[in-house]
A protein has these predicted regions:
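Conserved catalytic palm subdomain of right-hand nucleotidyl-transferase polymerases, strongest
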Residues: 24, 87-95, 133, 143-153, ...
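Active-site-proximal segment of RNA-dependent polymerases
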Residues: 55-78, 123, 128-132, 171-224, ...
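Conserved pre-motif C helix in the palm subdomain of viral-like polymerases
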Residues: 108, 146-177, 195, 219-222, ...
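Surface-exposed loop/turn segments and immediately adjacent short secondary-structure elements
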Residues: 2-146, 152, 156-160, 376, ...
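Short, conserved micro-motifs composed of acidic
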Residues: 262, 348-373
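Conserved polymerase palm-domain catalytic core
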Residues: 218-318, 326-333, 352-356
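Basic, alpha-helical interaction scaffolds
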Residues: 369-439
Length: 464
């Protein structure tokens, strides 16, 4: 693993790849801020406002724990410690996970004692409730704070307890989540949903059915989770009080700071949201989103696509939700229900990023969102006609771009031919073949793929 990491770094150096540092950002009035102190102050204001708790929503917890969960075992701590990924940035305490893994049994004993103390008292060390937020740019204007997502760096020691807590929660979560939710679930991934949407479109075309899609985008979904509503949802879904109380106390009095290239802000309180970067966040958000869909009545709704006696009207991957129906009216009905229930728990639809796609005629379109003929669905291009040729062409172009970017590597006489071949197989072919499980490949596309592979080897060998 270490050699692979070193090779990756050397490739970046040879290619001259570098990540642009955050420059100026805009203040409330749209003026550029260039001074480090001003930028830090702006990030402090933005994140404090983003994670501010709603004052009208007090915590009504009665503090009664009815059933206690079994104590934490040393073998659980050992498993959790060994499963933490190495070479990851440390949290606020600055302690790398490699230190705990070097100490082995000594670290296991100490961490087991701390975890068991938390398990019995429900009180977390304050250091374990602190996060360092790293703003990561998304699409859009990089001078707007809202176009960044904040990734949380947390203490590696706390990850041991969080992994154990997640493992205890998982059995309940798996029981509650439906088959249409593939986000952060074992054995499921983005390619499953890509295949599902392609097969649904294929069946609709086979039986001459029109199909209408709405690709929903939430504004800051993970950051807007209301904690008190979350605890209520966990209780309704049968999560044991013991686990809920541990989660409640973990999220109580949480603190964070924002770290950028311009420095680190002061610590501030977090009153809502689940941190992107925390082990538990995907699991908790999936339950939060499931409550929205249940209250919207999607499972009982008649609207949707009927396949093999089953009605399918949505596909989900965490917060990314795709609604589908056989008519405009049905789709609008589904969307209104989801929008209403989402707003009840503090989530708002991002209308600017919401897309509508239809394989049939549009007569009286009354749904917010941009109407499109194609959509990038979890990295794969889906077109209204269900044709895969557009995606195959796009993948081949992306592969060519990667291959061209590696030219300086292929020209190097210091790198052996077998290593160059491995680089093509590891860095180029996976880009081209992403989502290929669901492709319908015609003869023309087959020839195109073969020609691309031949082009790669010729370029590698410098054959004109």
């Amino acid at each position: 693993m270490g050699k692979t990491r070193d090779l990756s770094e050397k490739i970046k150096d040879t290619k001259g790849t570098s990540h642009a540092k955050m420059g100026s950002i805009k203040d409330r009035n749209g003026m550029d801020l260039t001074e480090a102190e001003d930028i830090k102050k702006k990030w402090q204001e933005y994140t404090e406002e983003l994670y501010k708790k709603h004052l009208h929503n007090p915590d009504n917890h009665d503090g009664v724990i009815t059933d206690l969960e079994p104590d934490i075992l040393e073998c659980e701590v050992k498993w959790a410690l060994e499963s933490i990924t190495t070479n990851k940035a440390s949290g606020g305490d600055g302690i790398p996970v490699e230190l705990f893994q070097i100490l082995k049994d000594d670290a296991v004993k100490v961490l087991h004692s701390i975890c068991q103390q938390i398990w019995k008292t429900y009180q977390w060390p304050q250091d374990w409730k602190r996060s360092v937020f790293i703003p990561m740019p998304k699409k859009g204007n990089a001078k707007e704070c809202s176009n960044y997502c904040t990734i949380a760096l947390i203490s590696h020691a706390s990850k041991v307890m969080l992994k154990i807590l997640q493992a205890r929660l998982q059995q309940y979560v798996n029981h509650e989540l439906p088959y249409v939710q593939a986000g952060f679930r074992k054995g499921r991934g983005t390619r499953d949903q890509i295949a599902n949407i392609r097969w649904i479109m294929e069946k609709a075309r086979e039986f001459l059915k029109n199909i209408y899609f709405c690709f929903i985008d939430y504004a800051k979904a993970f950051d807007c989770v209301d904690h008190n509503k979350l605890w209520k949802i966990l209780k309704e879904m049968g999560i044991p009080d013991h686990l809920t109380c541990l989660l409640r106390n973990l999220y109580a009095s949480q603190e964070a700071t924002v770290r950028t290239g311009h420095g680190t802000t002061d610590w501030f309180q977090i009153g809502k949201g689940v941190c992107q970067g925390c082990i538990l966040s995907p699991c908790l958000f999936n339950l939060y989103a499931e409550d929205i869909m249940r209250n919207a009545g999607l499972e009982e709704a008649q609207a949707g696509i009927k396949i093999a006696g089953r009605n399918i009207n949505n596909l989900r991957y965490a917060d990314d939700t795709t609604l589908m129906a056989e008519s405009e009216e049905e789709l609008k009905s589904l969307l209104m229900k989801v929008k209403e229930e989402s707003e009840k728990v503090g989530l708002k639809l991002n209308i600017q990023k919401m897309k509508i796609m239809a394989s049939g005629p549009i007569t009286s379109w009354e749904i917010d969102g941009e109407t499109v003929s194609d959509f990038i669905f979890w990295g794969s291009k889906i077109t209204a006609d269900g044709d895969c040729s557009h995606e195959i062409k796009r993948r081949l172009l992306l592969g060519r771009k990667v291959m061209t970017n590696l030219d300086s590597i292929f020209k190097s006489r210091d790198i052996t031919l077998p290593t160059k071949v491995r680089l093509v197989k590891a860095m180029v072919f996976p880009v081209v073949m992403y989502g290929c499980e669901s492709w319908t490949v015609k003869k023309a596309e087959h020839r195109r793929i073969d020609a691309f592979e031949l082009w790669c080897w010729r370029r590698l060998l410098r054959v004109p």
